[in-house]
From Swiss-Prot:
Protein name: Probable protein ABIL3
Keyword Cytoplasm: yes
Biased composition (Basic and acidic residues): 278-288
Subunit and partners: Binds SCAR.
Record's subcellular location: Cytoplasm, Cytoskeleton
Compositional bias of kind Low complexity: 196-206
Biased composition (Basic residues): 171-181, 207-223
Swiss-Prot/TrEMBL keywords: Cytoplasm, Cytoskeleton
Composition skew (Polar residues), residue ranges: 182-195, 226-235
Length: 317
């Protein structure tokens, strides 16, 4: 490619053309300004000129005998004065309109420039915000944990910046302790239910009790109140006679295999708890049997003084 070279003469001629164009524009604007100022001056002096012309025609009309010529000259002067005034007013209004348009164009241009600058500032702000977000997103470390380990109620941003702590993991011994506690709580309840079932009399026993009440007073005297030893033996028999329901041996082995290992200390604690529960149950059975015997003796015995068994039972009580 050939380099384009410009001579000094061409550069100087270009500058001269630019200067001539600028000077011509300045001269035209100056001429228009002068014309506008002259027209404004003429409008200002038009009132005084019209008043002086009216006085002159009035005096000339009175003194001159040729009134027709005076009237024609007056008409011509008034027409010329009106035309000149209209011309001046039109020129002034045109110049004023041009000035207003120029100023309005300048105002619109400035508004457009201001709006363009505001738009550029807005775009720059958006780009800065986007760049900051991209940098922050690069700094944020996403959590590497599974969703189920995220704690509920925590903020998403905090969980994204700081890794969520793992939930506490319990050992096998802790889980076995919990299982053993649940079993120890469930066993006394089941035994109490069996004790209550053994304690509640069957319908056949109730029938025998009603028959004994219907017997004669002599037989009632021979009948003795049941002792606590018999009740305890009966409860033992009912416990021993309660068969375990037949179950599948494979299912039993599966449940045994699933059970966690238990510490021997837990066996000791459970045995002590069972022993204390059993002693409390015996005491409750004794007190209940004594109360029942006393109530039966009160209901079945009519003669209090001649009843030796009642006095002996009261002595025992």
């Amino acid at each position: 490619m050939e380099a384009i070279t410009m001579s000094p003469s061409s550069v100087s001629s270009h500058h001269l053309d630019v200067d001539a164009a600028s000077t011509s524009e300045d001269m035209s604007s100056l001429q228009e300004g002068l014309l506008f100022s002259d027209s404004l001056k003429d409008l200002r002096n038009l009132r005084s000129q019209l008043y002086s012309a009216a006085e002159y025609f009035e005096v000339f009309y009175r003194n001159n005998s040729q009134k027709s010529t005076v009237m024609t000259s007056l008409k011509d002067y008034t027409v010329e004065a009106l035309v000149s005034t209209v011309d001046h007013l039109g020129f002034v209004s045109y110049k004023v309109d041009n000035l207003v348009k120029e100023r309005s164009d300048e105002v619109n241009e400035t508004e457009f420039r201001v709006s363009s600058v505001e738009q550029r500032v807005r775009i720059c702000q958006q780009t800065i915000d986007q760049e900051g977000r991209s940098q922050q997103s690069l700094l944020i470390r996403a959590p590497k944990y599974h969703r189920r380990y995220i704690l509920p109620g925590t903020d998403i941003v905090e969980s994204a910046i700081h890794p969520v702590s793992e939930p506490p993991r319990y050992s096998r011994q802790h889980m076995s302790r919990k299982m053993h506690k649940s079993q120890s709580i469930s066993t006394p309840v089941g035994r109490q239910s069996t004790m209550r079932s053994a304690r509640s009399p069957s319908p056949s026993a109730r029938g025998t009790h009603h028959r004994s009440r219907s017997l004669s007073p002599s037989r009632k005297a021979r009948a003795k109140s049941p002792s606590p030893q018999i009740i305890s033996t009966q409860t033992k028999e009912t416990r021993a006679g309660s068969p375990i329901p037949n179950s599948n041996p494979l299912a039993r082995s599966a449940t045994v295999a699933r059970r966690p290992p238990v510490h021997p200390k837990h066996f000791r604690q459970t045995s002590m708890q069972l022993h204390s529960d059993w002693s409390n149950h015996k005491e409750q059975e004794k007190s209940s049997s004594k109360g029942r015997g006393f109530l039966k003796s009160l209901l079945t015995r009519r003669r209090w003084r001649n009843d030796e068994s009642l006095y002996s039972y009261l002595d025992e009580y």
